[in-house]
């Protein structure tokens, strides 16, 4: 006897959902693996999801994008807690009326990928913003941190690769504080 599937289709992938992999939320059927946050693609559970117009979100991204509490207490860490004036300041353009402006979020862009940086994934170094995943060594892709990196001519390096590259070029004056490019280097160590 062959195993029979249901006639129900997954709302996310539109493929047949078998009983062993069936998950029902908001009267909609999903595969367990397809039950993911639209924003971060994280796996959801029935106890930790929200939906808006049939689109699934984890609680943090739902709150960030849709929740209007009238209070800034729920804002993500790093989000400015300064209210905007009711009318534009002199010389300032009024806010757009696009539908996208109705939703929360930010217009801050990552210098690594030029995509929007949300407060929960933001790394800020000297006023420059990065995603956590974009804040890495330019040469080797190594993980670096805001407290331990070298910025050289606008690029980020781990200490190991920066020293290696300078040795290959035969010019250590930048590391010792001499030379005309010394002002372009910033070494940060914890």
UniProtKB/Swiss-Prot annotation:
The modification N-acetylalanine is found at residue 2. It holds the Pfam family LIM. Signal peptide: none annotated. It is found in: Cytoplasm, Cytoskeleton. Residues 74-98 are annotated as: Disordered. The keyword Repeat applies. Gene3D superfamilies: Cysteine Rich Protein. CDD domains: LIM1_SF3, LIM2_SF3. Disulfide bonds: none annotated. Keywords: Acetylation, Actin-binding, Cytoplasm, Cytoskeleton, LIM domain, Metal-binding, Repeat, Zinc. It comes from the Eukaryota. GO terms for cellular component: cytoplasm; cytoskeleton. GO terms for molecular function: actin filament binding; metal ion binding; mRNA binding. InterPro entries: Znf_LIM. Expressed in roots, leaves, stems, flowers and siliques. Not detected in pollen. Residues 83-95 have a biased composition (Basic and acidic residues). GO terms for biological process: actin filament bundle assembly. Cross-links actin with a constant of dissociation of 0.4 uM. Interacts with F-actin. This is LIM domain-containing protein WLIM1. It comes from Arabidopsis thaliana (Mouse-ear cress).
